[in-house]
Amino acid sequence: MKKQLTKKQEEILEFIKKRIKEKGYPPAVREICEATGLKSTSTVHGHLTRLEKKGYIRRDPSKPRAIEIVDDDFYVHRNVIRLPLVGKVTAGEPILAVENIEDTITLPYDLVGTEDAFLLRVKGDSMIDAGIFDNDIIIVKRQNVAENGDIVVALIDDEATVKRFFKESDHIRLQPENKAMEPIIVKDVKILGKVIGLIRRM
């Protein structure tokens, strides 16, 4: 049985739940300060530590927003899904190998539409004309095939690249959405998934 909470701890917990419901991810410590009238981030950290010890939340101290509600019913009722954020992609390893996972992010299920998906942080500006910018997080549906015109995550020389896919007569063209860049022409390519959405934190 979980230990009882103080009024302030209840207020903080409810704000965290509200923010996850509205935004799909938990608030930063400073946002908790502002919402609950606490002046010091160290005071919030103290309350979060007690909420964790009492079994209401889980945290990863190495990540600033990694607060997870310890209540599976909460996630079911809020109709959200937790997806892995892949930090790196390596040839010969499963895309979701534990050592490749950088974080886990909670998103509304309606935004994703499938559990067979992962998140990947975009590096570079090769897709800016498609509205995909450096440091955006893309939502990728796992699949190993693609249709012409799909934006895909493909593995090239041990590195993941995001490009538009075109299968032509005797080769595959991975087309950037940036007029300053040339397409990548390959005989064959490993498709990791199709891009179905993106997240941009302002």
UniProtKB/Swiss-Prot annotation:
One annotated GO biological process: DNA replication
EC number(s) given by UniProt: 3.4.21.88
One Gene Ontology term of the molecular function aspect: serine-type endopeptidase activity
Pfam families linked: LexA_DNA_bind, Peptidase_S24
Reactions catalysed according to its record: Hydrolysis of Ala-|-Gly bond in repressor LexA
CDD domains: S24_LexA-like (cd06529)
Site (Cleavage) location in chain: 91-92
Active-site residues annotated for this sequence: 126, 163
Keyword DNA damage: yes
Keyword tags: Autocatalytic cleavage, DNA damage, DNA repair, DNA replication, DNA-binding, Hydrolase, Repressor, SOS response, Transcription, Transcription regulation
Location of the DNA-binding region in this protein: 29-49
Signal peptide: none
Subunit structure: Homodimer.
Family as reported in the entry's similarity comment: Belongs to the peptidase S24 family.
Primary role: Represses a number of genes involved in the response to DNA damage (SOS response), including recA and lexA. In the presence of single-stranded DNA, RecA interacts with LexA causing an autocatalytic cleavage which disrupts the DNA-binding part of LexA, leading to derepression of the SOS regulon and eventually DNA repair.
Cross-referenced PANTHER family: LEXA REPRESSOR, LEXA REPRESSOR-RELATED
This protein's name: LexA repressor
